[in-house]
Every structure is written in structure tokens, then in C-alpha cells.
């Protein structure tokens, strides 16, 4: 399976974590977004594109090799904020390594495509950079190494690079974090889970026309489409609600209406600029779909409780993610991997055919697996 880590300008929902001084504040992001600086210089962009491609290549290699030590070349661990930035990135890299062990898979041939949006010289030798990154991950199950799977993930990066001798180091970094709710893997790693996953096979699946159109729409407008014409793009008919707190339910509603031909009504509606709670809000969307009879439960609970039932999901169904008693995210199932593991497509962070639990591994996360009646 291939993961593409894509940094997308349409993904701008900001979540701050510990050690914020190693990350960007909201004001710093606004300042960098509004600065002209050297952003119009294609020569400067090309210079930093090469530097960042090397950075992301090393990060990818760390995931493939299972060795976070490879990340250290891009940080000065004697500088506190650079050390914190390294520790944050190492923790996320370790999560990917841990997830692959849980899943009994091996990553291979990761590749990143970096698109520089802006470079600003903040002071002599210190540059603020906004970039979009597309990283393709391949992985295979260890019992079937000849079968390669693929998916894509979108993120948007804000990075401070400081000249340090003959190289640049990262002093600050923030990006739309697909793993913010996923850094605790100890609660789900077990031989029982691994054995069950590798015992499965992808089911036969023949979607009707409505469902196929919904899948096609999801893959086209997810923000990380494999069609280069639509990469980093949403459907312009709809407002991007990421800056308002999230666009996941809006996109799930679009998939049903634009792709699946589900009709709008008074409760579930969008007028071109704004929508109802059932259309735009993750909790409201889940409640509406169940209450209206357009969908029904498959299972709900933490990962250990639902991972077997998840193999009953089919494209067109959706996963609602619960945190602290509230539904905070919606993803639509649009495919399977080679073991029949459900793959989801969504906005914020933009995902294309990503394993449904990747990025949602903390013990306080509950999954609502919901079947849609096409």
C-alpha cells in the first residue's frame, strides 16, 4: 500500500500540542502567510525545494528503516527549540513504525514531492517557509511481500530554517498533523490483532452506479487526488470550512449528494455558502444519517472492540471518530487494501485511501462504523 504524505494548502485546521515554542503560533502563521518577503523569487524557491526534498527523503528513510536517529541531521540538539522540534518529529516517526508492527506490514519506497509556496527571510540567515508535500508510501504485508498497497495523506507545513555553518537546521515546524490522536500504540498491539488481520482477504465488491460515482467524487476532490489536475484542490462550488474548524463533514456530505445523488432536505442542506448542522458538523452529520434512516450501525467502540467488525465495512460507508464524548471527525470508506482492511478518504487532514485507524490510535478514541444505505 502506498501512503502519500501531501501537504496541501487547503488543509489549515490548526491543533497545538505540548512544547508550542518549538511550533508556530497562530500569529506567526498569519504573519508568514501575509508576508511577501522573497516569496516571488523562483530561484530562492528552487534552492529550498532541494533542501526540503532532502529533509523529507531522510524522514521517509527513517520510517522504512525504523531508525529515528536518521532525523538528527536536520536539527541542532544543543538548541532547545530545535531539540523539541526533533523530539516531536521523532515521536511521530516512531508512531508510524509502531503502527506498521501492529498491522504486520513493512513500508518501502517512500517518496515526497515538495511544492514551495512561500519563502520569507525573517532575519539574516533565518527563513520561514510554507510548503506542500506529497509523500507516497508503499507497504506490503509480511506474509505477502509481492502485493504492494498504496495510499495518500495530505499535510501543510510551516518551517523555520536557520543557517548553521554549511547547512540549515530546523528551529520550528508546524504542520496539519495526521497523527495528533495516535501516538499511543501500546493499547492495541497484540498477536491476536495481527493474526486476525493477516488471515483476511479483500472481498469481491461490485458497486452500483450511484456508489461508484460517490467513490469517484471522493477520490477527485479529496485534496490529494492522484489526478494532477485536482491535486491540492477541493470542489470550488463549496466553501472550504477548514479555517472554520474543519471540512470533514462538508466533504462527506458532498460525496453523498454530488456523487451518490442523495437528495438535500430541510435538515441536511447546503446553499452555496453555508450549510445546516447535519451537513457541516461531524456530530450533526452522524446523528442525521442514523436518525433519518439513511444509515445504520455496524459497530462502535475502541479499536480492540471494533477491528473485526471493520472488515464488514464496504465503500460508501463511513467512520465517525469520537473523542471525549463527541464526534470530531468523519471519513468515508472508498476502498480496501489487499487484506480487506477498510481505507478511508476525507478532508482535514486530507486523506486518499488511508487505513481507517492510522492516526487514531490513542486509547480515548472510539470508532463508530456506519453503513450507508445506497
Features from the language model and the residues they span:
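Sec-dependent signal peptide cleavage junction
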Residues: 3-29
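Short beta-strand edge/turn micro-motifs at domain boundaries
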Residues: 22, 146-200, 342-347
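Core segments of small alpha/beta cavity-forming domains
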Residues: 24-102, 220, 258
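Surface-exposed, charged secondary-structure patches
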Residues: 91-143
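...with weaker cross-activation on analogous glycine-rich loops/strands in unrelated enzymes
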Residues: 106, 117, 123-124, 273-343
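N-terminal capping segments
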Residues: 196-279
Amino acid at each position: 500500500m502506498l501512503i502519500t504524505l501531501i501537504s496541501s494548502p487547503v488543509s489549515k485546521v490548526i491543533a497545538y500540542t505540548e512544547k508550542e515554542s518549538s511550533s508556530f503560533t497562530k500569529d506567526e502563521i498569519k504573519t508568514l502567510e501575509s508576508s511577501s518577503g522573497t516569496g516571488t523569487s523562483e530561484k530562492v524557491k528552487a534552492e529550498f525545494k532541494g533542501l526540503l526534498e532532502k529533509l523529507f527523503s531522510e524522514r521517509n528513510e527513517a520510517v522504512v528503516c525504523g531508525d529515528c536517529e536518521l532525523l538528527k541531521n536536520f536539527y541542532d540538539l544543543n538548541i532547545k527549540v530545535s531539540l523539541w522540534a526533533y523530539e516531536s518529529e521523532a515521536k511521530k516517526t516512531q508512531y508510524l513504525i509502531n503502527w506498521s508492527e501492529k498491522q504486520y506490514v513493512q513500508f518501502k519506497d517512500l517518496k515526497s514531492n515538495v511544492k514551495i509556496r512561500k519563502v520569507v527571510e525573517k532575519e539574516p540567515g533565518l527563513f520561514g517557509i510554507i510548503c506542500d508535500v506529497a509523500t507516497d508510501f508503499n507497504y506490503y504485508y509480511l506474509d505477502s511481500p509481492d502485493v504492494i498497497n498504496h495510499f495518500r495523506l495530505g499535510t501543510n507545513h510551516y518551517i523555520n530554517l536557520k543557517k548553521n555553518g554549511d547547512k540549515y537546521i530546523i528551529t520550528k515546524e508546524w504542520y496539519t498533523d495526521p497523527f495528533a490522536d495516535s501516538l499511543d500504540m501500546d493499547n492495541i498491539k497484540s498477536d491476536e490483532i495481527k493474526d486476525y488481520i493477516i488471515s483476511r482477504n479483500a472481498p469481491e465488491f461490485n458497486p452500483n452506479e450511484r456508489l461508484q460515482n460517490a467513490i469517484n467524487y471522493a477520490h477527485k476532490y479529496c485534496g490529494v487526488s492522484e489526478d494532477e489536475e485536482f491535486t491540492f484542490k477541493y470542489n470550488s462550488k463549496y466553501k472550504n470550512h477548514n479555517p472554520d474548524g474543519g471540512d470533514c463533514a462538508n466533504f462527506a456530505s458532498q460525496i453523498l449528494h454530488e456523487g451518490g445523488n442523495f437528495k438535500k432536505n430541510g435538515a441536511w442542506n447546503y446553499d452555496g455558502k453555508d450549510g445546516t448542522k447535519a451537513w457541516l458538523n461531524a456530530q450533526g452529520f452522524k446523528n442525521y444519517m442514523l436518525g433519518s434512516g439513511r444509515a445504520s450501525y455496524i459497530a462502535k467502540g475502541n479499536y480492540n472492540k471494533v477491528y473485526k467488525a471493520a472488515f464488514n465495512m464496504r465503500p460508501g460507508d463511513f467512520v465517525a471518530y469520537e473523542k471525549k464524548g463527541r464526534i470530531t471527525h468523519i471519513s468515508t470508506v472508498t476502498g480496501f487494501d489487499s487484506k480487506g482492511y477498510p481505507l478511508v478518504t476525507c478532508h482535514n487532514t486530507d486523506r486518499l485511501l488511508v487505513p481507517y485507524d492510522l492516526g487514531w490510535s490513542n486509547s480515548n478514541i472510539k470508532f463508530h462504523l456506519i453503513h450507508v444505505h445506497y
